[in-house]
């Protein structure tokens, strides 16, 4: 006869309690995530070094006292932000101040001195070919020295550098005496340099072997006597852009780092006078962008020059403009392009005039960040005196009138062995900005950098805690599901074991005849309080 089993499985009470505890934990977690952070904020405010917030964020309801403290804190915070914004705007304007100072030194480097005779060509040195080629440049008619028009002779192409070198005033003939700091000097101490005035000469132009002076005052610098050779000046037939109506020399005092730009920066010295030039060295320091507009020494140098200077920049601009318009360069311009011939002079003058009219729009020359210049004070006395005119006349075999019309004395010296420093400085730098903001922060809200770190640390902890509480329920649900699956597996295994055991016992009873064929014993319920399963069987 078939046997029917009716089985009821009941889990232990502790499993029910564990499930209840898990539900309770979930409810408490939800309550914790929904609870306001008043207590946490109050705890942070009581421990923070930020002034005032410990009176605002307190446990309990918001009262009048907390409201007044909140208003005071907001007003202080607004004032701090206003002052901090003003400081930031002032810093972004990049202001600077100029500091003037004077420093003494036991010795000073003597400046370079460039001199040029205002007359560029000696009339006695010109050949018929020179006069023919230089007609457009000098204004002289294309005639030979006898006043006749040249025949059909073919003159060779002119070499302007050779013409300047050959027909210019020679220093050996002009220099009558030379003295530097009590020691004699000569024309060999000068170097040839070409300018808009032709062949010129520079004293102490080599910066590697520059001369120094150890005393200030007259007689401790350069003193030279020159003969300007006025009788050899070119006759003026008509005025051109290159002719000059003056007599004398042009002088420029400059540093060894810059080329002479004597036609614009030089000063004139006339014959018949002794000119005293008292110099004061000035060392200027400018600020680069964004505080100033100077050119840093780290930037690319101008081709042909070792050091950047305004004079070198201007010469470079003139060279590029003449090359663009006339496809040549003048003798004094740097480069290796072809030198312009006298027939190109009109084109050159036009190009330079256009460059000058542009007022620096096409060629902007920045001021170098480090610059040396020389302030000058000039004074003059007439020479020769009546007593010295006769002596000089006999000494140089010239007439007294010639000496009055051609001789001059130039005396250049330092006023004192000191120099001025004119330096641009940042009026408001990063250190000043941080100091002002820190002072305003401490004055209005009593905070510091560490206070800001406290606030950031609190915000980090709050965000971290919120994220952990949002992710914790998911982990708890997953863990609970795994526990239920494990419990179900254990119950199934126990049930199978019990079925197998009961089947073996009933088979053994049938074989022994211990119970009736129609009635089986009915087992009572057994309640167990430990981690075991209770069951009922009915047939």
Curated annotation (Swiss-Prot):
| Record InterPro entries | ENaC (IPR001873), ENaC_CS (IPR020903)
Q: Which residues are glycosylated?
A: 136, 165, 179, 184, 206, 241, 370
Q: Which residues cross the membrane?
A: 69-89, 433-453
Q: Where is this motif: GAS motif?
A: 446-448
Q: List the disulfide bonds.
A: 116-200, 178-185, 294-369, 313-365, 317-363, 326-347, 328-340
**How is this protein situated with respect to the membrane?**
Multi-pass membrane protein
The answer to keyword Membrane applying to this record is yes
- Source domain of life is Eukaryota
Q: What compartments host this protein?
A: Cell membrane
Annotated region Disordered: where?
Answer: 474-494
Q: Name one GO biological process term.
A: sodium ion transmembrane transport
One of the record's GO molecular function terms: voltage-gated sodium channel activity
Q: Which residues face the membrane's Cytoplasmic side?
A: 1-68, 454-539
- Principal location: membrane
What controls its activity? Answer: Inhibited by the diuretic drug amiloride.
Catalysis: reaction(s): Na(+)(in) = Na(+)(out)
How is this protein annotated for GO cellular component?
apical part of cell; plasma membrane
**Physiological role:** Could form pH-gated trimeric sodium channels and function as a postsynaptic excitatory receptors in the nervous system.
Record PANTHER family: ACID-SENSING ION CHANNEL 4, AMILORIDE-SENSITIVE SODIUM CHANNEL-RELATED
Name of this protein: Acid-sensing ion channel 4-A
Give the gene that encodes this protein: asic4a
């Amino acid at each position: 006869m078939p046997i029917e089993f009716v089985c009821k499985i009941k889990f232990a009470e502790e499993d029910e309690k564990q499930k209840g505890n898990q539900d309770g934990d979930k409810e408490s977690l939800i309550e914790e995530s929904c609870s306001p952070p008043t207590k946490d904020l109050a705890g942070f405010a009581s421990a923070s070094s930020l002034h005032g917030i410990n009176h605002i964020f307190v446990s309990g309801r918001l009262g009048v006292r907390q409201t007044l403290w909140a208003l005071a804190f907001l007003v202080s915070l607004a004032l701090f932000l206003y002052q901090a914004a003003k400081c930031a705007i002032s810093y972004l304007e990049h202001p600077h101040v100029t500091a003037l100072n004077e420093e003494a030194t036991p010795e000073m480097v003597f400046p370079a001195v460039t001199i040029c005779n205002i007359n560029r060509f000696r009339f006695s040195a010109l050949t018929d070919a020179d006069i023919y080629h230089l007609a457009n440049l000098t204004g002289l008619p294309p005639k030979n020295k006898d006043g006749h028009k040249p025949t059909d002779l073919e003159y060779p192409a002119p070499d302007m550098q050779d013409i300047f070198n050959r027909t210019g005033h020679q220093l050996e003939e002009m220099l009558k005496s030379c003295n530097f700091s009590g020691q004699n000097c000569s024309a060999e101490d000068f170097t040839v340099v070409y300018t808009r005035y032709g062949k010129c000469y520079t004293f102490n132009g080599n910066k590697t072997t520059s001369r120094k002076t150890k005393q200030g005052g007259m007689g401790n610098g350069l003193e030279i006597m020159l003969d300007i050779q006025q009788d050899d000046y070119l006759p003026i037939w008509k005025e051109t852009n290159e002719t000059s109506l003056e007599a004398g020399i042009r002088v420029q005092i400059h540093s060894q780092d810059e080329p002479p730009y004597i036609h614009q920066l030089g000063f004139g010295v006339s014959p018949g006078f002794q000119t005293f030039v008292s110099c004061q060295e000035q060392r200027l320091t400018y600020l680069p962008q964004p505080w100033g507009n100077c050119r840093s020494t780290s930037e690319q140098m101008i081709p042909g020059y070792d050091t950047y200077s305004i004079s070198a920049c201007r010469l470079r601009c003139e060279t590029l403009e003449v090359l663009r318009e006339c496809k040549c360069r003048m003798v004094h311009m740097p480069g290796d392009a072809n030198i312009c011939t006298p027939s190109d002079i009109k084109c050159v003058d036009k190009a330079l005039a256009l460059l000058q009219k542009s007022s620096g729009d096409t060629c902007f020359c920045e001021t170098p960040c480090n610059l040396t210049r020389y302030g000058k004070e000039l004074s003059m006395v007439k020479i020769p005196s009546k007593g010295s005119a006769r002596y000089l006349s006999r000494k140089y075999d010239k007439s007294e009138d010639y000496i009055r019309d051609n001789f001059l004395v130039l005396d250049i010296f330092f006023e004192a062995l000191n120099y001025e420093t004119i330096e641009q400085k940042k009026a408001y730098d990063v250190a000043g900005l941080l100091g002002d903001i820190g002072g305003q922060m401490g004055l209005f809200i009593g905070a510091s950098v560490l206070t800001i770190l406290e606030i950031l640390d609190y915000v980090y902890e709050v965000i971290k805690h919120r994220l952990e509480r949002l992710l914790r329920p998911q982990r708890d649900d997953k863990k609970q599901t795994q526990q239920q699956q494990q419990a179900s597996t254990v119950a199934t295994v126990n049930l199978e074991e019990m079925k197998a055991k009961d089947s073996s016992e009933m088979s053994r009873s049938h074989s022994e005849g211990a119970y009736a064929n129609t009635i089986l014993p009915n087992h009572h319920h057994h309640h167990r309080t430990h981690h075991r399963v209770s069951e009922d069987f009915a047939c």
